[in-house]
Amino acid sequence: MSQPWPAVEIARMILAGFDDYRDHFQRITLGARQRFEQARWQDIQQAAAARINLYEEKVAEVNGWLRQAFAAEVLLDVEQWPLVKNAYIHLIDPRLDDELAETWYNSLFCSLFSHDLISDGCMFIHTTRPSMRGRERAAQTRTYRLDGSLRNLLRAVFADYPFDMPYGDLEGDLARLEEQLRECLPDWVCKDPALAVELFVPVLYRNKGAYLVGRLYNSDEQWPLVIPLLHREGHGIEADALITDEAEVSIIFSFTRSYFMADVPVPAEFVNFLKRILPGKHIAELYTSIGFYKQGKSEFYRALINHLASSDDRFVMAPGVRGMVMSVFTLPGFNTVFKIIKDRFSPSKTVDRATVIDKYRLVKSVDRVGRMADTQEFADFRFPRSKFEPDCLAELLEVAPSTVALEGDTVLIRHCWTERRMTPLNLYLEQATEGQVLEALEDYGLAIKQLAAANIFPGDMLLKNFGVTRHGRVVFYDYDEISFLTEVNFRHIPPPRYPEDEMSGEPWYSIGPHDVFPEEFPPFLFADMGQRRLFSRLHGELYDADYWKGLQAAIREGKVIDVFPYRRKAR
């Protein structure tokens, strides 16, 4: 008699692997408080990278478990996997993180089978989880009522958020926060006896900051609320700001930021809480912001297929200068660009395909300091041919035939990245007012400086490789030439040996593969002389090799810079 097919055993092993992953994820996350209290800034960066890498490492480990435990002809019998899915559904029903467990299952399935075997019968293309469930669980938020004064309300808040490192000047902090709150809200709101504060119980940690996150509300309105805390070494914990502007809070949870570390026992509930105070954010971005980037990827994919099914939108080439390495297309009604690697690069590019892939993957694991767009990597996307404008499809097939192929009425995209769509900076400047040009060039220089201080050198700093977000921030998004700043050799141009040297079309000095001459930046970056002069006035130090060498020295000494995800006026 043949043995029954081991669907339940396979499902249990997949879930055991998920438990192991979540345990390691939680261990790294729970260490965030101590790292903050002890000002272990470099450990924070290492922990963030380790937590990002953890998912793929654990998927590979569980893949190995399965292959060792079950014969290939059993494990890889895809016709039986609906039984595994059904068994898995029953196993995860009691969980508080079941949507993450579904995504984990999908990752294991894709690690075992080719993508052309993907179906909703075998996988969770559509979630089986209800978006909100009424369950008995510990409260994830605390509520504070106006008790006589704003100062008393704030004092009650901070009494519930102690640290092993004491607050340096709590009464001074409370006075400043009360003043900022009165500036942010109308006077009648501050005096409204119905005014209350609701805060998420766990503190959110990222880089050098800790964040209290929640909302202010009365019987009629609500406002998001974020209170960033800093550890001033030698001075204790300090409340750095109070932020109630939705756009400012949205930037804190931006796709350009590193992921928060927060103890989130019920991820869906926390994401729904954030969604209520930031209705403009997609849940994919909110999941990603707290470190569940694979769940963010799942939610993004579901939103994409729903958009394609419910609209007449068709893929078109993205506006802007065509890339020398990547080809970029988009859906006009979907705020995302899709990037594929061309088969042949422009002659001026010295990178190869493998290097480009490594560069894009690097971006996910480094501190993006609010200046680099996060990416999601996909394999074997399949779309109906009818969803492409003919000229877009023709261009993709021409420049990347090894990546884009036709399978009857289906377009197969073997490999791509997605990024948030932005307005290319060069196009933005063409339409900008004088004031907007000033703000954009100021922020462009700040973006370069902040990336550099985080040990990232963009390489190709042309305006077309930066975008402007809906909040007016300048963000870098073309990664094929990025490197660590400490790998670059910044040099002054040597003086000419003879008068004829300056007239020559060739340099009179040797140039190594990692050499960069900042004095050459002005004509390289700006054809417009007015913009060139303005940028020189705003950020002229970027043209000096000594400025870059000073940053390199600070990085080598182990200094970790402060880059705040909120504007100066909020502090």
Curated annotation (Swiss-Prot):
Residues the entry annotates as binding ATP: 318-324, 339
GO cellular component: cytoplasm
Localization per Swiss-Prot or TrEMBL: Cytoplasm
Active site, renumbered: 374
ATP-binding found in the keyword field: yes
Keywords, in A-Z order: ATP-binding, Cytoplasm, Glyoxylate bypass, Hydrolase, Kinase, Nucleotide-binding, Protein phosphatase, Serine/threonine-protein kinase, Transferase, Tricarboxylic acid cycle
EC number assigned by the record: 2.7.11.5, 3.1.3.-
Main location: cytoplasm
BP term (GO), one: tricarboxylic acid cycle
GO function term, MF aspect, one: AMP binding
Catalytic activity: L-seryl-[isocitrate dehydrogenase] + ATP = O-phospho-L-seryl-[isocitrate dehydrogenase] + ADP + H(+)
Source taxon at top rank: Bacteria
Family: Belongs to the AceK family.
Function: Bifunctional enzyme which can phosphorylate or dephosphorylate isocitrate dehydrogenase (IDH) on a specific serine residue. This is a regulatory mechanism which enables bacteria to bypass the Krebs cycle via the glyoxylate shunt in response to the source of carbon. When bacteria are grown on glucose, IDH is fully active and unphosphorylated, but when grown on acetate or ethanol, the activity of IDH declines drastically concomitant with its phosphorylation.
Protein name as annotated: Isocitrate dehydrogenase kinase/phosphatase
Organism: Pseudomonas putida (strain ATCC 47054 / DSM 6125 / CFBP 8728 / NCIMB 11950 / KT2440)
Classification of source organism: Bacteria, Pseudomonadati, Pseudomonadota, Gammaproteobacteria, Pseudomonadales
